[in-house]
Amino acid sequence: MSDFLPFSRPAMGAEELAAVKTVLDSGWITTGPKNQELEAAFCRLTGNQYAVAVSSATAGMHIALMALGIGEGDEVITPSMTWVSTLNMIVLLGATPVMVDVDRDTLMVTPEHIEAAITPQTKAIIPVHYAGAPADLDAIYALGERYGIPVIEDAAHATGTSYKGRHIGARGTAIFSFHAIKNITCAEGGIVVTDNPQFADKLRSLKFHGLGVDAWDRQCGGRAPQAEVLAPGYKYNLPDLNAAIALAQLQKLDALNARRAAIAAQYHQAMADLPFQPLSLPSWEHIHAWHLFIIRVDEARCGITRDALMASLKTKGIGTGLHFRAAHTQKYYRERFPTLTLPDTEWNSERICSLPLFPDMTESDFDRVITALHQIAGQ
């Protein structure tokens, strides 16, 4: 369908094209100076001392958990209402994911659910800043300090999000995503921010074969041509082609997120006349990045199931998303944790639907979505 409206579309323009051309013309297209520029720029955004660019947020999560020494016999607490990559990385390191419930209305993991899951084997807590809103960091970090457990913030949805006046990440260690649907994108990529220099050094080594330096450092830093392997590592570095796009996007972040916020405000106003329930906003002071606009489709209230709504919108040429099917209901995790029940996560997992939301979305696009929702609700 030529006029299909996707639920997300990257906002690319002349700046990104120029950035790519600059890198191509430079003769150095893999990890190099643009990575360094991106890391410095992201530190200015979040207020952290160190940033490590990686090939994806999943890669960032993998090496962050490795840098903490997570392994066999350890437990890591995280909500089930998250993308499965976090659970996968925990399992692949030999540790056990301890999935906890979320608040029914905000879909934020709560400190009460986290504390109830803490055991002597708990070695990390991973809160998720869901859909662009922040989790309650004061309470979560207080738990980490009380029990001596590191906190790694899953900030994949949170570029531009702030909590009580500070950008997400400023409290410690956080992982951001530059995936194609995120608030800023370079197709694929991510970045880890931290204030711990030893942790940052571990990340840099783990992301590039376990070497002490990367190819650009050897090229321009006068180092020996063959670097030393400090410990086995991975190939998770971000090419400068991608870093240059991310830099161009980062310069537009305020404008991109302002447009997202404007569309979200229009959605909230329109929902007053519709039976679909948006997520509630957290009660603490925050700035929402509006990565997603999510409604809950309860058949008893709306007269239609979520899946039927998504199918109906598709026939009208409108795309939607599901963020997320609860991780513990996926086949592998369902079979591994057959007795796990998380009532509020499960209730929402069966009803949530992400509506189209992206900076280049026009007023006509928005009107089309709302008209379709009215038509479906009136059937």
From Swiss-Prot:
HAMAP family: ArnB_transfer
Gene Ontology biological process: lipid A biosynthetic process; lipopolysaccharide biosynthetic process; response to antibiotic
This protein's name: UDP-4-amino-4-deoxy-L-arabinose--oxoglutarate aminotransferase
UniProt GO cellular component terms: membrane
PANTHER family tied to this protein: TRANSAMINASE (PTHR30244), UDP-4-AMINO-4-DEOXY-L-ARABINOSE--OXOGLUTARATE AMINOTRANSFERASE (PTHR30244:SF41)
Enzyme class: transferase
Function: Catalyzes the conversion of UDP-4-keto-arabinose (UDP-Ara4O) to UDP-4-amino-4-deoxy-L-arabinose (UDP-L-Ara4N). The modified arabinose is attached to lipid A and is required for resistance to polymyxin and cationic antimicrobial peptides.
Pfam families, A to Z: DegT_DnrJ_EryC1
Highest taxon of source: Bacteria
Cofactor list: pyridoxal 5'-phosphate
Oligomeric and partner information: Homodimer.
Catalytic activity annotation: UDP-4-amino-4-deoxy-beta-L-arabinose + 2-oxoglutarate = UDP-beta-L-threo-pentopyranos-4-ulose + L-glutamate
Entry GO MF terms: pyridoxal phosphate binding; UDP-4-amino-4-deoxy-L-arabinose aminotransferase
N6-(pyridoxal phosphate)lysine: residues bearing it: K182
Family listed: Belongs to the DegT/DnrJ/EryC1 family. ArnB subfamily.
UniProtKB keywords: Aminotransferase, Antibiotic resistance, Lipid A biosynthesis, Lipid biosynthesis, Lipid metabolism, Lipopolysaccharide biosynthesis, Pyridoxal phosphate, Transferase
Pathway: Nucleotide-sugar biosynthesis; UDP-4-deoxy-4-formamido-beta-L-arabinose biosynthesis; UDP-4-deoxy-4-formamido-beta-L-arabinose from UDP-alpha-D-glucuronate: step 2/3; Bacterial outer membrane biogenesis; lipopolysaccharide biosynthesis
Documented EC number(s): 2.6.1.87
